[in-house]
A protein has these predicted regions:
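Active-site activation/catalytic loop segments of kinase-like enzymes and analogous catalytic loops
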Residues: 221-257, 271-290
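Conserved protein kinase catalytic-loop anchor
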Residues: 185-187, 205
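Catalytic-loop of the protein kinase fold
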Residues: 187-189, 194
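All-alpha amphipathic helical-bundle segments outside canonical DNA-binding/catalytic cores
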Residues: 259-271
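ATP-binding pocket architecture of kinase catalytic cores
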Residues: 26-149, 156-184
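Activation of the activation-loop gatekeeper triad in protein kinase-fold domains
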Residues: 208-213
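Juxta-kinase regulatory segment immediately upstream of eukaryotic protein kinase catalytic domains
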Residues: 1-20
Length: 320
């Protein structure tokens, strides 16, 4: 690492912790198309520096300053998240924040397939429901910058793609024609799924990646982990490739008293697939336009067609 950049990390961690520390060599972790994640130890304490990447992958992503505030609110509400230490406005030219580095597995495919995590997978449905109930109890007034999402926002985003995608358009039409009764909006994680959690042999360690937090129907958050893309090849396990939906829904209803019905999950599962399909297209266009040449973004363009196929499957299920 260039000496000046390392010094910037040293200064940032010192500022965030509020004390002089010596840090290890920062290591850039794999993944994270929209944010960088750097592992670093400060006087032996494991930390993670979350830093803005070049450009903005999605226009509705929170700034890191706002994401840090959401993380802090979640931590203080009792949600299992990394301890937030401090926000830094300028780390080598980009904003960042410093938080605890949790130990465990984060790679989705490993979480759903590793034999040593089999027992954990049995615990995760109830554990995920318990944490999501806490997320939805975060006082919205603490986070006045959060905006409300809507089906209409997805329509606008698809229009900006400016090419025909009839499966997505049909999905959006169906969603507008079959809206369930609106529930009271709550603070939502916005990307609550396997791949944004830390897991060890005892189950859930913590929730990560709060950059899509917003105000919404709680069932939208509850159902996002059902999207097929987040099953990582274990398609028979509808809940994120780890298990069945029933214990997850039962535990969430028990804790919140909302009495969410399975057909509501079905509706928002389709909405989640439509949102992810549009996300794949818009991110792939960053590569195709030359704005941000990236193999990862190009791959998302191919994945988008798989999600469109899933939308057709879910529409067929809805019509049965």
């Amino acid at each position: 690492m260039i000496a000046d950049v390392r010094e910037a990390f040293q200064a940032a961690v010192t500022e965030a912790l509020g004390r002089e520390v010596e840090i290890s060599e920062p290591v850039l972790l794999a993944g994270g198309a929209s944010k960088e994640a750097w592992a670093v130890d400060a006087d032996g304490e494991p930390l993670l520096v979350r830093r803005a990447a070049v450009g903005v992958i999605h226009r509705h992503t929170l700034s890191l300053a706002h994401e840090f505030e959401v993380l802090r609110a979640a931590f203080e509400t009792g949600v299992k998240v990394p301890r937030p230490y401090g926000y830094v406005a300028d780390l080598a030219g980009r904003e960042a924040f410093v938080m605890e580095r949790l130990e465990g597995e984060t790679i989705g495919r490993r979480i759903v397939q590793k034999p040593e995590l089999e027992a954990a997978r049995g615990l995760l449905p109830a554990q995920l429901a318990e944490e999501l109930a806490k997320v939805h109890a975060i006082p919205a007034e603490r986070l006045p910058f959060l905006t409300a999402a809507a089906i209409e926002r997805m329509v606008e985003e698809l229009d900006e793609v400016d090419e025909p995608h009839p499966a997505i358009e049909l999905g959006l039409w169906w969603l507008r024609e079959n809206r369930p009764p609106a529930r009271q909006p709550v603070v939502c994680h916005g990307d609550f799924r396997i791949g944004n959690v830390v897991v060890d042999e005892h189950g859930l360690v913590g929730l990560l990646d709060w950059g899509f937090a917003h105000l919404d129907d709680p069932v939208r958050d509850l159902s996002f982990g059902l999207v097929r893309a987040w099953r990582f090849g274990m398609d028979s396990r509808r809940l994120g490739g780890i298990g069945d939906v029933e214990p997850y829904l039962e535990r969430y209803n028990e804790l919140t008293g909302l009495e969410v019905r399975p057909e509501e999950l079905d509706y928002w599962e389709l909405a989640g697939n439509v949102a992810w399909a549009i996300g794949c297209l818009t991110q792939a266009q960053r590569h195709l336009s030359g704005l941000d040449r990236s193999v990862e973004l190009a791959i998302l363009g191919r994945l988008g067609s798989e999600v469109e196929y899933e939308i057709c499957h879910l529409l067929e299920r809805a019509a049965a």
